[in-house]
């Protein structure tokens, strides 16, 4: 789906229905799950700013408060998971300014795919997957590969994430699911 109005205009997402569950995974926001329903009842929180596409309120200091939407979860990291801070030159870690909850939560997914297939056990499996790259020229290059799986008729989802450092140097890693 693609949202057409307001701050969500242009936001691309994938809607999955497995019988008792309905959820929406945002392709433009790290495949985080923004809506989650069980038998038609909403189980998620939506913050006052509402749904947002990637915009100017993403990665500077406290401006994240203008784009954090809530949802079932959003991914925080990889260089910061809490309040914004600045690392000085000459320290143990690379110098820089790190926004509230990091940048990965606003990173659009690449190589996005959705699939539905039968298993040998007779389960009908629904999957959404993609990868997000948090990178900077001469800096970090961290790639998260995410797969969200649900089995038709079962009231659960499984989120599998793997982060790989594809940089030329060791990188600090902070990672949190904000629920």
Which positions does each model-derived feature cover?
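Surface-exposed acidic/polar loop and edge beta-strand patches at domain peripheries
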Residues: 1-152, 156-158, 170
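Short, acidic/polar linear motifs in exposed loop/turn regions
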Residues: 166-168
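Histidine-centered catalytic micro-motifs
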Residues: 174-179
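A conserved active-site cap/scaffold subdomain adjacent to cofactor or substrate pockets
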Residues: 160-164, 173
């Amino acid at each position: 789906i693609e949202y057409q109005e307001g701050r969500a205009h242009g936001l691309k997402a994938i809607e999955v229905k497995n019988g008792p569950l309905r959820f929406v995974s945002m392709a433009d926001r790290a495949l985080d799950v923004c809506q989650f329903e069980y038998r038609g009842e909403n189980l998620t929180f939506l913050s006052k700013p509402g749904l947002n596409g990637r915009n100017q309120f993403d990665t500077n200091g406290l401006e994240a408060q203008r784009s954090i939407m809530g949802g079932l979860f959003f991914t925080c990291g990889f260089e910061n998971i809490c309040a914004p801070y600045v690392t000085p030159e000459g320290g143990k870690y690379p110098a820089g300014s790190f926004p509230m909850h990091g940048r990965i939560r606003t990173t659009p997914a690449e190589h996005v795919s959705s699939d539905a297939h039968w298993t040998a056990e007779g389960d009908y499996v629904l999957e959404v997957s993609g990868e997000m790259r948090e990178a900077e020229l001469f800096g970090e290059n961290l790639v998260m590969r995410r797969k969200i799986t649900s089995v038709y008729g079962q009231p659960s989802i499984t989120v599998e994430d793997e982060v790989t450092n594809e940089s030329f140097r060791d990188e600090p890693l902070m990672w949190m699911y904000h629920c």
